[in-house]
UniProtKB/Swiss-Prot annotation:
<dbReference type="InterPro" id="IPR036661">
    <property type="entry name" value="Luciferase-like_sf"/>
</dbReference>
<protein>
    <recommendedName>
        <fullName>Alkanesulfonate monooxygenase</fullName>
        <ecNumber>1.14.14.5</ecNumber>
    </recommendedName>
</protein>
<keyword id="KW-0288">FMN</keyword>
<comment type="function">
    <text>Catalyzes the desulfonation of aliphatic sulfonates.</text>
</comment>
<dbReference type="InterPro" id="IPR011251">
    <property type="entry name" value="Luciferase-like_dom"/>
</dbReference>
<dbReference type="GO" id="GO:0046306">
    <property type="term" value="P:alkanesulfonate catabolic process"/>
</dbReference>
<keyword id="KW-0560">Oxidoreductase</keyword>
<dbReference type="InterPro" id="IPR019911">
    <property type="entry name" value="Alkanesulphonate_mOase_FMN-dep"/>
</dbReference>
<dbReference type="Pfam" id="PF00296">
    <property type="entry name" value="Bac_luciferase"/>
</dbReference>
<dbReference type="InterPro" id="IPR050172">
    <property type="entry name" value="SsuD_RutA_monooxygenase"/>
</dbReference>
<dbReference type="GO" id="GO:0008726">
    <property type="term" value="F:alkanesulfonate monooxygenase activity"/>
</dbReference>
<keyword id="KW-0285">Flavoprotein</keyword>
<comment type="similarity">
    <text>Belongs to the SsuD family.</text>
</comment>
<keyword id="KW-0503">Monooxygenase</keyword>
């Protein structure tokens, strides 16, 4: 099975270490463009753009990077309750048209009650999922060319329609992640691809089976994806040393404050991430080569695959055997790690090489010359 590998745009900040300003770097448009262009050239299929008040706006970031990339797709957040589904459908169609069919959409219900209240959304967890189902039903139908009347508990529209259709037909794909029963019900009914954060394979297998069964009851099939960090090096020892360095500036007070902040979230997925490490730095390898250190201070995806290329590839294939075909990776710092993952991991996976124009001698395709006039040896076949 050919895998879809995505990268990640760190619009909330980037650096060499977690929990400190040391080694941090400014995430401006130039830096985001560097990461997007690297991902485009290296053969990543797309990039996930995060959402929330700690991030730059995902739609504006995507729109600004369309002109500086060629093949890269942009996975952008849809926020039910914060925007009208009809307006969101128009925006989605425009982004798809302007990007020449490079727009993908990620339904995000939100998990931080404080942030949601600041955005004017005062719904409980259950009510947010009710509203998200209504939003998605309208959004899909409008994008597919229907004129929609809908009288829901949370959303009412009359004569909602779209005059400029998307390029992707019947509409761009919809991604979504959530661990609660309500989230799985929504995924089974509404989305093309269900995402999970990087839990141990047995836990992921259970979630996939649940969503697959619920989708089958509705006569649907759903694809599956996973969101993971990656720390890959030439040897396993180097990879684990890099993992240790990433959290080398963390102290228990910083971890405790981060976990206290995340504890207010009503996201089941966030609770499952926190349970993997319990706020402690011992026993962070929660499954072979699956390391929970990132989640000590980072919300959302909190686990990383750690090892050399063949080892990480074996773990990726373990998830793929469960039915996952899409992997959304990231690493710190995101520019350098996009190259490491492509160079050290891709050769061991079924990933299509990036399309490149035929070289005509304007740039050297072989690496740096040796002693001015000697070509370097060709790389050994993987």
């Amino acid at each position: 099975m050919s895998l879809n590998i995505f990268w990640f745009l760190p619009t909330h900040g980037d650096g060499k270490y977690l929990g400190t300003a040391e080694g941090a770097r400014a995430v401006d448009h130039g830096y985001l463009a560097q990461i997007a262009q690297a991902a485009d050239r290296l053969g990543y299929g797309g990039v996930l753009i995060p959402t929330g008040r700690s991030c730059e706006d995902s739609w504006l970031v995507a729109a600004s990077l369309i002109p500086v990339t060629q093949n890269l797709k942009f996975l952008v957040a849809l926020r039910p309750g914060i925007i009208s589904p009809t307006v969101a459908a128009r925006q989605a169609a425009t982004l798809d048209r302007l990007s020449n069919a490079r727009a993908l959409f990620n339904l995000v219900t939100g998990g931080d009650p404080d942030e949601l209240a600041g955005d004017g959304l005062h719904l409980s967890h259950a009510e947010r999922y009710e509203a998200s189902v209504e939003f998605t039903r309208i959004w899909r139908r409008v994008l597919e060319g229907e004129t929609v009347d809908y009288d829901g508990k949370h959303i009412q529209v009359k004569g909602a329609k779209l005059l400029y259709p998307p390029i992707q037909q019947p509409r761009p794909p919809l991604y979504f992640g959530g661990s609660s029963d309500a989230a799985q019900d929504l995924a089974a009914e509404q989305v093309e691809l269900y995402l999970t954060w990087g839990e141990p394979p047995a836990a992921v297998a259970e979630k996939i089976a649940q969503v697959r069964e619920k989708a089958a009851r509705q006569g649907r099939e759903v694809r599956f994806g996973i969101r993971l960090h990656v720390i890959v090096r030439e040897t396993n020892e180097e990879a684990w040393a890099a993992a240790d360095r990433l959290i080398s500036h963390l102290d228990q007070d910083t971890i405790d404050r981060a976990q206290a902040s995340l504890a207010r979230f009503d996201s089941v997925g966030q609770q499952r991430m926190a349970a993997l490490h319990g706020g402690k730095t011992d026993n962070l390898e929660v499954s072979p080569n699956l390391w929970a250190g990132v989640g000590l201070v980072r919300g959302g995806a909190g686990t990383a695959l750690v090892g050399d290329g063949p080892t990480v590839a074996a773990r990726v294939r373990e998830y793929a055997e469960l039915g996952i075909d899409t992997f959304i990776f990231s690493g710190y710092p995101h520019l350098e790690e996009s190259y490491r993952v492509a160079e050290l991991l891709f050769p061991h996976l079924d990933v299509a090489p990036p399309a490149r124009p035929e070289s005509r001698g304007y740039v050297s395709p072989f690496g740096e010359m040796i002693s001015s006039d000697i070509l370097p040896k060709a790389a050994a076949a993987s």
